[in-house]
Regions:
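Outer-membrane beta-barrel proteins
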Residues: 49-51, 70-80, 95, 108-116, ...
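Short glycine/proline- and aromatic-enriched beta-strand/turn motifs that initiate or cap beta-hairpins
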Residues: 19-64, 227-229
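Transmembrane beta-strands of outer-membrane beta-barrel pores
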Residues: 27-33, 59-63, 75, 91-97, ...
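Repeated loop/turn-to-beta-strand initiation elements of outer-membrane beta-barrel proteins
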Residues: 21-23, 50-57, 78-87, 115-121, ...
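Sec-dependent N-terminal signal peptides
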Residues: 4-15
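Predominantly the C-terminal beta-signal and adjacent terminal strand-loop region
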Residues: 171, 178-230
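Residues that define the transmembrane beta-barrel architecture of outer-membrane proteins
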Residues: 35-41, 63-69, 85, 100-106, ...
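Flexible, solvent-exposed loop segments that connect beta-strands
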Residues: 87-101, 129-143, 175-178, 211-214
């Protein structure tokens, strides 16, 4: 039994060691009339385990006292010269200690991407509960069974070009999922330094409010990050 466990462990280690890793860190500044100024720091890692499968994990902390954990994976379903059809599944957990609340999100969508464009359409649900969890639920527990998610983004060049600019419209980002009618608009770009190091930047506007409650005006955000492919 011990030999079997050791053999399986070595095979798993060898499999993961051969995988292609991507590491990313990103700092962001955000301003809204409801919350004022805030900053956040995020760390993300992606692992390409096979040609048609990758898995990613992300962590974010903000000066407003919000903490987020994002786990996701993608599976390529079909490849053609015109693009790739893929399935994405992500799970997002957000913690709001100041409000004594926590939020669980699950998202499943289909996507189509090619050298210049990416389009995704899917469904998500959300479960919000107090801290600590109550065994019998209660009036403070809410469940949103279905919400439509979408993302449309395009780039001037393909992803192998040494620099690029593009735009994105969606109702979700790595660490937040909004309702279908609340959009994020952003412009983004990157520059490759070589040796697997890439500088990224993004600026955009987004809905105001907290805990997915919207206001009648927008806030804005900007971020700068580094991506490293060992």
């Amino acid at each position: 039994m011990k030999k079997t466990i050791l053999t399986l462990s070595l095979l798993l280690f060898a499999f993961v060691a051969r995988a292609q890793w991507t590491l990313q860190t990103c700092g962001e500044y955000d301003y809204t009339r409801t919350s004022g100024s805030s900053a956040s720091l995020a760390f993300k890692g992606d692992c390409q385990l096979a040609d048609n499968f990758n898995i990613g994990l992300g962590l974010q902390a903000t000066t407003l006292g919000r903490y987020s954990l994002n786990l996701q994976y993608q599976v390529n379903l079909f490849k053609a010269k015109s693009g790739t059809l893929y399935l994405e599944n992500r799970y997002l957990y957000r913690l709001f200690p100041n409000y004594k609340l926590q939020e669980f999100n699950a998202l499943l969508d289909l996507g189509w991407r090619n050298r210049h464009f990416n389009f995704q359409l899917g469904l998500t649900n959300r479960y919000t509960a107090p801290i600590p969890l109550r065994k019998n639920g209660g009036m403070d527990v809410t469940f949103e069974p279905m919400n439509i998610t979408f993302c449309v983004e395009g780039n001037l060049f393909d992803q192998e070009h040494p620099w690029n600019v593009g735009g994105r419209i969606s109702n979700y980002r790595d660490f937040v999922i909004e309702r279908f009618t609340l959009f994020f608009y952003s412009l983004n770009g990157y520059y490759d330094f070589g040796n697997g190091l890439r500088l990224t930047a993004e600026a955009g506007v987004h809905p105001c409010g907290v805990l997915n409650l919207s206001a009648q005006y927008n806030g804005w955000f900007g971020n700068v990050g580094l991506i490293w492919k060992p």
